[in-house]
Amino acid sequence: TLNALQALIVLKPEAAYKMAGDFARYLRFTLDSVTADGGIGSFREEIRAVRAYADINQQQLGDRLHMVYEIPDVDFPIPLLTIQPIVENAILHGIKPKVGGGTVSLKLEELPDHWQVTVTDDGVGFGLEAVREKGSIGLENVRRRMARFSGSELRITSTVGVGTQAVLTYGKQGKNMENLSKST
């Protein structure tokens, strides 16, 4: 990212200025997430970080990366660094290696007892053996964060050559609101 920023400063100063702002927002969110009490924050904060991260990659990938957001203007407590790493995986491991690039979509749905975030990419996909070989520290960290948050889970399905879908479910009740109020 810093190398790309350095190159943009000379070639496209306006784009470099925007990328520096996106990078600063992304770093601020990441650092704040590490120090957050209980690791609980707001959905809006997480989506701001996702957008900053996607915009940085948009500068690098250009037309090869398309982002689609179906996100209503709502906010609720979530464990931090759960959506952003999923989007990061979609871009790095799904879209970047695909000839011609692809699309990453984020959709939020409100259901009676939980919120559901679906991250879908039409990238290269992966098989179970790829996860076993490479390990998946990032996904394991997301699962661990979500396990501490009552009523939350992560489900991932992927097909080689077709893409990947991650469904993150966040419970609405009890412990979640208490954790958020403790962290503010």
Which role does the model predict for each range below?
Residues 162, 167-184:
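C-terminal end segment of the histidine kinase catalytic
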Residues 1-155, 165-167:
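Two-component histidine phosphotransfer core
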